[in-house]
Design a protein with these regions (language model features):
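Active-site and donor-binding regions of nucleotide-sugar-utilizing enzymes
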Residues: 1-131
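Short active-site oxyanion
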Residues: 1-3, 90-95, 188-190, 224-227, ...
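Short, solvent-exposed loop/turn segments at secondary-structure junctions
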Residues: 9-12, 44-47, 63-66, 100-103, ...
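Donor nucleotide-activated moiety binding/catalytic core segment of transferases
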Residues: 22-37, 191, 196-237
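A donor-sugar binding/catalytic signature common to diverse glycosyltransferases
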Residues: 38-61, 66-68, 215-260
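Conserved catalytic-core segment of nucleotide-activated headgroup transferases in glycan assembly
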Residues: 123-203, 275, 312-314
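Catalytic binding pocket for nucleotide-activated donors in carbohydrate/polymer assembly enzymes
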Residues: 204-205, 234-305
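C-terminal alpha-helical cap of glycosyltransferases
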Residues: 309-322
């Protein structure tokens, strides 16, 4: 196979042997599309592309589980935006599903034939089913931290009704680090990774709060981190495969449910720890830092009908080649 990687920011990509990087909607992008046999995306299909006979369109989707409402099920979705669903999704040959709840709810939300759903689990999550010391080393080398340094990943999600430029009171992240360092006798850092739709900046003077967006691969950060703090980001599904603690900001969950899209699965049934707000994080993080939630998460995966087994890439390749 000839592999083409499409991005809006080719200058940020690490060059790898056998992979050509092109800018989205550039002349090279359209030329290469004309001769590609398989087009893979993690969202909608670019409306500027005209599908040729014999081409395969596949989406891996960008969120695991089936937490946030999508498609026609959304509460405040723009009607013009919603009118484009058919144009974006009806051309799909395959939709990769992480769990039975995803198949059931997304088929209805996007009016898709259930036959196109590949119930394989998510390719990006295969890494959580085996040991990858090289991933940890990559992250540690990038941020110049030692093997003993612990990582708290702070990864808030996108909310349409939130201010265009949102700030969190990062004093509580600093306090959390102080408390964790005192309790564990280890050094800690925070990687602050904002959603790419939202301009959130790290204006902390604390040198232990680092730019999580500077690193190119979110799954590497999830694999390497010891704790995850978020609001309603679907990365909770991915991180739960590690069995490590997930902390949710409950005030943001309530806002999203009442003012934005809402949830397919009520958030009070999720197995993750809930902080009233970011001010409650220091106490919660210290209390639950060493807990193993594997059993609790396993029950949740069973309820959702998880397809995650660590073999998604292998299964999808077999389907595409046959």
């Amino acid at each position: 196979y000839e592999l083409i990687w499409v991005t809006r920011f080719p200058e940020t990509c690490t060059m790898r042997t056998g992979i050509t990087v092109v800018r989205q909607r550039s002349l090279s992008y359209f030329k290469l599309f004309l001769r590609c046999g398989i087009f893979i995306t993690n969202d909608m299909i670019d409306e500027a592309l005209v599908k040729k006979r014999g081409q395969i369109f596949l989406t891996t989707w960008h969120g695991g589980g089936a937490y946030k409402k999508v498609g026609k099920e959304t509460i405040n979705e723009d009607k013009t935006f919603a009118a484009n669903f058919d144009k974006w999704y009806k051309r799909l040959d395959y939709f990769v599903s992480s769990c039975q709840a995803c198949t059931d709810m997304y088929a209805e939300a996007f009016s898709l034939d259930r036959k196109i759903f590949l119930e394989t689990g998510t390719p990006r999550n295969d890494i959580f089913f085996s040991k990858h010391p090289e991933i940890k080393k990559r992250v540690q080398d990038f941020y110049h931290i030692s093997e003993q340094t612990k990582i708290l990943l702070f990864a808030p999600s996108f909310q349409m009704t939130a201010p265009e430029k949102e700030q969190y009171d990062l004093r509580y992240l600093s306090e959390t680090i102080d408390r964790l360092e005192e309790a564990t006798k280890n050094n800690w850092i925070v990687l602050y990774r904002s959603h790419y739709f939202r301009e959130e900046t790290n204006e902390s003077l604390d040198e232990r709060i680092l730019d999580g967006n500077a690193y190119y691969e979110m799954q590497d950060l999830l694999y390497t981190s010891d704790l995850l703090v978020t609001d309603f980001s679907s990365c909770i599904w991915d991180f739960a495969l590690t069995g490590r603690p997930v902390f949710l900001l409950e005030n943001r969950l309530k806002e999203y449910e009442q003012m934005d899209r809402g949830f397919f699965v009520p958030y009070d049934t999720w197995p993750y720890l809930k902080c009233k707000d970011i001010a409650a994080l220091p106490d919660m993080a210290v209390k639950y830092r060493d807990e193993d939630f594997t059993t609790l998460y396993k029950q949740h995966f069973e309820t959702m009908g998880s397809f995650e087994k660590g073999t998604a890439c292998e299964q999808i390749l077999h389907i595409l080649e046959n």
